[in-house]
Amino acid sequence: MLLDPEDWSLAQCAPEVLESLPPELVDHTDGETHRSTLELRSDPHPDAGSLCDQLMSLRHGLAAAVTARGMRAGAAGLHGCTTWADTKVTESPRYDIVHDSMRVLARREPTFGLHLHVGVTDREEAVRLSNRLRAHLPILLALSANSPFWQGRDTGMRSARTPLFQGFPRVGVPRAFADYRDWVEAVDVLVRCGAVPEPSFLWWDVRLQPRFGTVEVRVLDAQTEVADTMALVALFQSVSRLELLEGHTSERLLDSPEALAENRFLAARDGMDAALLDPAGGRLVPARDVLAELMEACAPHAEALGCAAELALVDELARSSGADRQLSLAREGGPSAAMAGLARAFLAPPPSELAPAPSKPEASRPASRPPAAA
């Protein structure tokens, strides 16, 4: 998000910033639906360490371009003080379609998400991974929760972005697909009937990206610091390998769309303080216990992928999420102080141990060799 340091409101200057970017940033920066929003896009990376280096470089380049215009850059799931009346939308062919179809929904306050991709080798594997990742969306959301304020108020939610974005169609947890043909047939109905022009207008929490050869997770709030992004990247990559090689998740949970949807809400409301439904045991389980068990299962996969140092950062994120830090800043200075904190933390360096990992031999990777991309 782009911020005006005069009062930490949203700055409506994304098109002007895009025109002033240096060449090395042009291919990695895009406008979004709102004029206060820019998207940074990484390249695919074989390991989390090299991704971390690029994300820091992109943030420094963007911050310099934004600061040259007297503004600042920040990142979170929502701007906690803005209202729909303060926002301006972007004009482009794609976003004209969004605005025309979404009407007032597309003109409300912008939401900011972190979208992660993992590479897979074939379409059937992509469907299988997408199906199984649905069970892990609540934990990923709880860890990433970074939007407690909306229109200047404490919402009582750790991720208010989640229910706000739910107002859009074609969002939330997708159904399980039997195979790639089943996925194609489901999407084809929407395209042939004119509901969407192409599959990227499906904004599910996890979705296939056939043109990239990836599975994409979209449930996450944008992260204020790169270190938090790297923790989520490592967990996502490790969980993907775990599911592809071991099929870790309970089939009972995967077969319960009601439990998956409820866990998503609980994670958005309570973050890591949530208690999540366990259909197999017929009970609620603290999210911290779910995470502890998952971290233990992921540890050998993180070692194989070269992201063990990044995965270790998950523990700190579980103790203090972006939402927790915003709430702490707001206790003394109100929500606007939390927005100022987003700008201060935008270039916070990651821990020094997060150096690019050495290349791993192919035998140590799963058949899918999932690269990480943010």
Please tell me what each predicted stretch does.
Residues S92-G113:
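Acidic, His- and aromatic-enriched active-site or binding-groove loops in soluble protein domains
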Residues W84-D96, T155-V171, R264:
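Short, low-order "capping/linker" segments at domain edges
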Residues G70-T87, Q151-T155:
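Short, glycine/charge-rich beta-strand/loop segments that flank catalytic centers
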Residues R107-L133:
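Internal, well-ordered domain-core segments that constitute the primary functional module
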Residues D122, S130-F177:
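An exposed, glycine/acidic-rich loop-and-rim segment of catalytic or binding clefts
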